């Protein structure tokens, strides 16, 4: 592949004079480019919705969401995966981020790590990949060998696969069941895909993980009701969620949360139904953890 022909590698005619601009002009030019990212992502929403449903289906069948990428793309996957346990109360390992070159590549580039298809396969083998898992390959260029190797192995293993790239009709898109390709255009700094391409990928990952968790029963209304209250700020947030979801006072909310070890869902159910903590947990379990269903049935 001639990398110079990729949209993400071409020069942007609107930013050819970066080194001659004043600082206010420079940041304005970057901001003007960034405004195009949301529109590019908007054009991919039907495919993002398919990926959300596939991610939710993986979780409901006992599988995992596995992100894999190199460089910026890999770091974004690791970032999104690492936020899921504290935000949604899921176990570490339910959402996984793989980066070419291993954990050390998060802080320091590992040269050449992305160039091996076998490394992508090997990293999935090391995770004991199962057919219930969803594998999401991330590559702004759409041609990273590490990601291609991983997606190919995942499909051969019976997994549903998703490709996220910022170039149209990319090689990783051809390896995946679902292709999400927000074409953000040439970067303000030629080839620096940590810019618009990275922003677009982050927006897509936000929707995939959050959407999947909504459909996995981790959200009530727009509240993260399975959040783990592990510090002072989060204990306060747990109290506010119970107050906002039920209309009870702060003191009563704190009393209920102490009875549930600061688990928000059973505290809300107790406030709205009069159940005790054990009965609230039992009812939630009967409805697979979906608070709305437990309240309505």
UniProtKB/Swiss-Prot annotation:
Q: Which UniProt keywords are present, listed alphabetically? A: Carbohydrate metabolism, Lyase
Checking InterPro entries in the record gives: Etherase_MurQ, Glucokinase_regulatory_CS, MURQ/GCKR, SIS_dom, SIS_dom_sf
EC main class here is: lyase
Q: Keyword Lyase on this protein?
A: yes
Q: One MF term in GO for this entry? A: carbohydrate derivative binding
Its function? Specifically catalyzes the cleavage of the D-lactyl ether substituent of MurNAc 6-phosphate, producing GlcNAc 6-phosphate and D-lactate. Together with AnmK, is also required for the utilization of anhydro-N-acetylmuramic acid (anhMurNAc) either imported from the medium or derived from its own cell wall murein, and thus plays a role in cell wall recycling.
Family, per the entry?
Belongs to the GCKR-like family. MurNAc-6-P etherase subfamily.
The protein's name? N-acetylmuramic acid 6-phosphate etherase
């Amino acid at each position: 592949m001639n990398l110079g022909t990729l949209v993400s590698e071409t020069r942007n005619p609107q930013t050819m004079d970066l080194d001659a601009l004043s600082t206010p002009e420079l940041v304005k030019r970057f901001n003007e480019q960034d405004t195009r990212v949301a529109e590019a992502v908007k054009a991919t929403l039907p495919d993002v919705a398919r990926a959300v449903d596939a991610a939710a289906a993986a979780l409901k069948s006992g599988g995992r969401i596995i992100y894999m990428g190199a460089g910026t793309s890999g770091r974004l996957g690791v970032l999104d995966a690492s936020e899921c346990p504290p935000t949604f109360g899921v176990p570490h390992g339910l959402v996984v981020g793989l980066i070419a070159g291993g954990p050390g590549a998060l802080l320091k580039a590992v040269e050449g790590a992305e160039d091996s298809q076998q490394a992508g396969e090997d990293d999935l083998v090391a995770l004991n990949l199962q057919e219930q898992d969803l594998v999401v390959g991330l590559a702004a260029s759409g041609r990273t060998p590490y990601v291609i190797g991983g997606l190919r192995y995942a499909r051969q293993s019976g997994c549903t696969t998703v490709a996220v790239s910022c170039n149209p009709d990319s090689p990783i898109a051809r390896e995946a069941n679902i292709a999400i390709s927000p074409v953000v255009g040439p970067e303000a700094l030629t080839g620096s895909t940590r810019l618009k391409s990275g922003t677009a990928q982050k927006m897509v990952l936000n929707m995939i993980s959050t959407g999947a968790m909504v459909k996995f029963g981790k959200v009530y209304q727009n509240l993260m009701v399975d959040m783990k209250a592990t510090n002072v700020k989060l204990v306060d947030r747990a109290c506010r969620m119970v107050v906002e979801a039920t209309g009870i006072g702060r003191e009563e909310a704190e009393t209920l949360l102490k009875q549930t070890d600061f688990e928000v869902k059973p505290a809300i159910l107790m406030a709205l139904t009069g159940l005790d903590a054990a009965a609230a947990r039992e009812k939630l379990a009967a409805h697979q953890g979906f608070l709305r269903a437990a309240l309505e049935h």
